[in-house]
Amino acid sequence: VAINQAGVDVTTAVAAATGRVVIYAATSAGVPGPLLYLGTEDLDLSTVGFKFHTLAFTFQAGKLYYVGFIHGGTAVIRAIQGYSLPAFGLASSTSAAPLSVLSQTVTYPNAPVEFAFDASAHLAARAAPSVRMRVA
């Protein structure tokens, strides 16, 4: 499936806030691996509304991808609550909150060329950014 737009819906704008969409391929183990796409320009999150990158990216059938969003500010974007997402598991045998989001701390605007997945450091029970895409 080819897409020509990917972006986020800003619900609370913050002056000078910016962000970028990222797409990672999965490794043979099914965890995030190499970076396939990093938005080439900052998305301006200083006003509300849909902000998008124009791109040419094709998702290949039968492959797993991880789509995310990195940002350099505190603007609020539309998100999907963690309880509405597929769970990766629980943090412990007594935990009630499913781990449903993968996250990594990076220095904006850089995204690592390899995600370097570590379950203990990257799994979280929280909302995930809602990245919207348009089919080309």
Residue locations for each model-derived region?
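A short beta-strand element within beta-rich, extracytoplasmic domains
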Residues: V1-A13, V67
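Surface-exposed receptor/substrate recognition regions of extracellular proteins
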Residues: V1-A2, A17, S103-T105
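Intrinsic-disorder/low-complexity regions
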Residues: I3, E41-L43, P109, F117
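Intrinsically disordered, low-complexity regions of eukaryotic proteins
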Residues: T11, D44-S46, S120
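Aromatic- and Gly/Pro-enriched, solvent-exposed loop/edge beta-strand patches characteristic
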Residues: A15-L99
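Short, surface-exposed beta-strand/loop patches at domain edges
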Residues: I70-A136
